[in-house]
Every structure is written in C-alpha cells, then in structure tokens.
Amino acid sequence: MPNNAHLLAQLQVLVDFPGIDGCALVETATGMAWHVAGNFPEVERISEAAIEFWRVQHRLSEHLTALGAIQSVAYSFSNRVVALFPCCEDPGLVLVAIAAKGPVAWPAWGVKVGAFRLAVANLLESGKGLNKPPNLVTSQNG
C-alpha cells in the first residue's frame, strides 16, 4: 500500500515517543484497526475494544457541549493509560494510544498527533484514500 507509507511512518513516530507502548488507527463504525504499531501485547485487540469508549462519549456528546469540542479521551487503568484522539469524521477514524502510567509529555506528543492527523487528511484529500489492510476485510478480531 504505497499511499499509506507516510501514514505508517507517522504512526511509528507516535509509538517511538517515550512512554507510548502502542497505537492503532481504528474505524469507529466497525471497530476495526486499520493500522497498528508498537510492541505492547494485544495492542490491536485492546485498541479495537477501546473504541467503545469513543462510542459512549459520542452518545453522550449532547450533554457535554458546554465543554467544547472533544480533543481527546483518556482512561486510566492500574497498569496503563488508554487515550483516544479523533482523526477524521468521514470515515470516522480515531487514534488509540496505549501508554505507560509514568510521565508522558502529552503536549509534545499532541504535536506529533497533529502531524498524524494531517497525514490522514492528506491521504483522504488526495483522492487516494486510506487503504484498509486486505486481511481486515474478512477479519473477525475481538
């Protein structure tokens, strides 16, 4: 998938950031991970399950409008943090990150997320679109 090479490189940049253990670009409608990076065990399965957090937020969004547009959602577990960042509305794509509980420079990482969002937008605007990996068309993960 040559048109996704830059996107995959940007995803790897996110995972290489100190404290980040894994990332996935997940489609909100299907809950399927399109692209995954990182060495954390089961990053794909966890990311696909975590999209349910995003769906809950979306269902409750009318009650949260006074807070402004959502920029991220984070869930803290005893061993890790799962953070979700919107990337695109059509198709609905969310970046899911699994991070260490220790200090992560989230503002600096957010700048890198901005570059990733731009890579997603550029692929969509170029008319080339984002290619789902072929194995995900029939995959029944999770």
Q: Could you describe each region identified by the protein language model?
A:
Residues M1-D21, T30-G142:
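Acidic, low-complexity cytosolic segments
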Residues E27:
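Conserved acidic functional residues
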